[in-house]
């Protein structure tokens, strides 16, 4: 089941990246990892760097996807973002923390994508 969930997650991230590109974002990184944590997508548009957590689900039986971005998860994303900005020397940008929810339909290939800008703050 874990491997299946991981492949659903990667598919959701790919769909999210395509959506962001259509919306005029440039993708800076996908699956950025450091000792502080992981960021699914880092994108930029209009001088705003967005650190994006993608949550993909077939069902809301465990709550909606955004609810799984807990305070501790937010902290790890924030710390990873600080590290990324420092390493890349990106100091003169606005930043934002977003969540993209991808809800797949079990009985078809359809999905719903919900882009939650400024989902949490430092």
Curated annotation (Swiss-Prot):
Ranges annotated as spanning the membrane: none
Gene Ontology MF term list: nucleic acid binding
InterPro entries noted in UniProt: Restrct_endonuc-II-like (IPR011335), tRNA_endonuc-like_dom_sf (IPR011856), UPF0102_YraN-like (IPR003509)
Pfam families: UPF0102 (PF02021)
Family label: Belongs to the UPF0102 family.
Listed HAMAP family: UPF0102
Alphabetical list of PANTHER family matching this protein: UPF0102 PROTEIN YRAN
The protein's name: UPF0102 protein CPF_1959
Species name: Clostridium perfringens (strain ATCC 13124 / DSM 756 / JCM 1290 / NCIMB 6125 / NCTC 8237 / Type A)
């Amino acid at each position: 089941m874990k491997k299946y969930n991981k492949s659903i997650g990667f598919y959701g991230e790919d769909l999210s990246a395509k959506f962001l590109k259509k919306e005029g974002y440039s993708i800076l990184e996908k699956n950025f990892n450091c000792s502080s944590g992981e960021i699914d997508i880092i994108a930029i548009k209009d001088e705003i760097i967005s650190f994006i957590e993608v949550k993909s689900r077939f069902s809301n039986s465990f709550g909606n996807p955004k609810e799984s971005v807990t305070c501790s998860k937010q902290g790890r994303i924030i710390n990873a973002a600080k590290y990324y900005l420092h390493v890349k020397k990106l100091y003169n940008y606005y930043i934002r923390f977003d969540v993209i929810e991808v809800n797949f339909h079990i009985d078809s290939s359809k999905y719903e994508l919900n882009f939650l800008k400024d989902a949490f703050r430092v």
